[in-house]
């Protein structure tokens, strides 16, 4: 009935059967960001936020999010992830705003890709920074979240 991969013959949602796919090394890298004011920036780099170490907590949240992606994205397969890395890079915009660029890199050896895990990790990392610093300023801006690259699998490699 349907040519959609995640819809069954009755028109209802289904998770795709990947049992016949080849096992390959798969990686994905995703980006997100959050722009903060100078007070929050100083608290983060000086590690003086009242809730604790913002970047360490956000990094752990990103790792946990990648590991739990299949529990929050309905058609995502649970995967045995072989590596997760969350990295940070500050961009100083002017004397009043600072952007924390977040890179999440996820890898596995499996039958389906890890793009959603990388995107979920990057998103959760930015959300955790917001959560830990919102008492200082609720005007932070979470920026674009997107896939930077992926490798492995039938569709091949992708680079933004």
From Swiss-Prot:
Subunit and interaction comment: Homohexamer; trimer of dimers.
UniProt-annotated binding residues for substrate: 75-77, 116-117
Reactions accelerated catalytically: (8S)-3',8-cyclo-7,8-dihydroguanosine 5'-triphosphate = cyclic pyranopterin phosphate + diphosphate
Alphabetized NCBIfam families for the sequence: moaC (TIGR00581), PRK09364.1 (NF006870)
Role this protein plays: Catalyzes the conversion of (8S)-3',8-cyclo-7,8-dihydroguanosine 5'-triphosphate to cyclic pyranopterin monophosphate (cPMP).
InterPro entries: MoaC, MoaC_bact/euk, MoaC_sf, MoCo_biosynth_MoaA/MoaC, Mopterin_CF_biosynth-C_dom
Gene assigned in the entry: moaC
Protein name (Swiss-Prot/TrEMBL): Cyclic pyranopterin monophosphate synthase
Keywords: Lyase, Molybdenum cofactor biosynthesis
Listed EC numbers: 4.6.1.17
Domain of life: Bacteria
Coiled coil: none
Keyword Lyase: yes
Family statement drawn from the similarity comment of this UniProt entry: Belongs to the MoaC family.
Single GO BP term: Mo-molybdopterin cofactor biosynthetic process
Entry GO MF terms: cyclic pyranopterin monophosphate synthase activity
Active site (record annotation): 131
UniProt pathway annotation: Cofactor biosynthesis; molybdopterin biosynthesis
Keyword Lyase included in the entry's annotation: yes
